[in-house]
Regions:
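Glycine-rich phosphate/adenosyl-contacting loop at the front of the ribokinase-like
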Residues: 1-73, 265-273, 277, 281-287
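Conserved N-terminal subdomain of the carbohydrate kinase-like
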Residues: 48-128, 280-287
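Hydrophobic beta-strand scaffold residues
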Residues: 49, 75, 154-156, 188, ...
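A short, aliphatic-rich alpha-helical micro-motif
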Residues: 117-119, 178-181, 212
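Conserved beta-alpha-beta core of the PfkB/ribokinase-like small-molecule kinase fold
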Residues: 123, 128-204
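Conserved phosphate-donor
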Residues: 186-196, 206-236
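Conserved post-catalytic alpha-helical subdomain immediately downstream of the catalytic base
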Residues: 233-287
Length: 287
């Protein structure tokens, strides 16, 4: 089956409470993990999204896989292990208590990845929670190489504020994120990412540092606006429902590939940022 987007990350059982976890007696079970959430959003738009992750061969792992499949996510690349359990995270009142050390998700190593699933994929996406020091971080490096060899767009969504509770030290998180920024073709950034990485929410202070390595396109999500930059042009739009999943879905529908990124013009960026939820086609070439 052709997959337009492939995400690498973790899937965990998220037990959510209305109050702080230590104060509650009832939790609501949810599917957690950035990659799982992104794939579900992409599938809801009508796109094909596959999740590359490892779960425990336990009831929790099987339940999460069934939920993802029910939501339209391609689960053919999920793997299961008897050696580690499915991770569990307790959340509530802006608090996250992760139990993921020595669990299946972080134990996914590069030796378990093959190049074949990356062929024909339009984009490979990853975030920061899974870059913690573990076999999974090494798997990210191999996946990036495989995606680049296959000609897929490499997209990094740092989401540092959301990833911070899942790292032992915030400084290590930021240092690792800086090491991965220039490995991506496309960055989806938030103001909190800039604050943690560069000490400022102002993008202009960081643009020079960001446009290095493979980076050709940056989407910057502010409180009320979204900005898009290539190395030569920019566009902006009022922020509404233009999630990274929607923007990437539009890129896939427009047929934008890695080789097209340096040539994108302002009108194409404007279509990608459009408030019109039905905007998925670009007339003519994308540049």
């Amino acid at each position: 089956m052709h997959m337009s987007v492939l995400c690498l990350g973790e899937v965990w059982l998220e037990l959510n409470a209305a109050t702080a976890p230590e104060l509650t007696e009832a939790f609501r079970a949810q599917t957690g993990g950035w990659g799982a959430g992104f794939c579900r959003q992409y599938a809801a738009l009508g796109g094909q999204a596959a999740l590359l992750a490892q779960l425990g061969a336990d009831p929790f792992g099987r339940k999460l896989a069934a939920r993802l499949a029910r939501d339209g996510v391609d689960c053919s690349l999920l793997c299961f292990t008897d050696a580690f359990p499915t991770p569990v995270v307790f959340t509530g009142a802006d608090t996250a208590l992760p139990y993921r050390a020595h669990t299946a998700g972080l134990a996914l190593g590069p030796e378990q990845l093959e190049a074949a699933p990356f062929r024909g994929v339009s984009a490979f996406c990853f975030s920061s929670a899974g870059l913690v020091d573990s076999p999974l971080r090494l798997a990210h490096l191999k996946a990036l190489a495989a995606a680049r060899d296959a000609g897929a767009l490499c997209c990094y969504l740092p989401r540092l504020a959301q990833a911070a509770p899942y790292w032992p030290q915030r400084e290590a998180l930021c240092q690792t994120a800086l090491q991965f920024l220039d490995r991506a073709d496309v960055l989806f950034l938030e103001e909190s990412d800039l604050l943690l990485l560069f000490g400022s929410r102002e993008l202009r202070t960081a643009l020079f540092a960001l446009f290095t390595g493979h980076v050709q396109l940056i989407f910057f999500y502010k409180k009320d606006r979204i900005l898009a930059f290539t190395r030569s042009v920019m566009a902006s739009a009022a922020k509404k429902d233009q999630s990274p999943a929607l923007v990437l879905y539009r890129m896939e529908q427009m047929g934008i590939h890695v080789i097209d990124l340096p040539q994108l013009r302002e009108h194409v960026l404007e279509q990608l940022l459009s408030n019109d939820a039905n905007t998925t086609e670009c007339q003519g070439l994308p540049y």
